[in-house]
Amino acid sequence: MNAKELEKLLDCCFIAKKIIETLPALPKGIKPRHIHVLHVIYKLEVHQEECCVSDISRTLNITLPSVTKLVKELEERELIKKLSKTQDKRTILLKLTDKGEAYVKKYVLEFHGKWADNLADISTEQLEQTIQTITRLQETMPGLEN
């Protein structure tokens, strides 16, 4: 890859970031990051796994203080609830409320399902190549701690 090709790739990444930041229209006071956190909790709950702040931090690659702030905001909006782990009361588990689960279904599952239908012509091979390219871009980014 030469510098001009890299520039085109980075332009596409910028466009992709804008797509993620603007879709879909969310309720007042809800940010895309809130939906990402709700989705992580949902995915863990579906697999009957427990979810802690550290799980969200690791999955979304964001700092613990950032996750703590998002969790507080979601709890204030009654989208999640905190529970103490039975064996260790110091460990706080996160659970979706019915309202939180409804948000995931509407703003993630249904939305992604409809969007995926519109992208049915993209092959698994094309998708895997795109994922590999973006992953490689992240891994080789100068100044990024891996």
Residue spans of the language-model regions?
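Terminal interaction helix/tail motif
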Residues: 7-12, 109-146
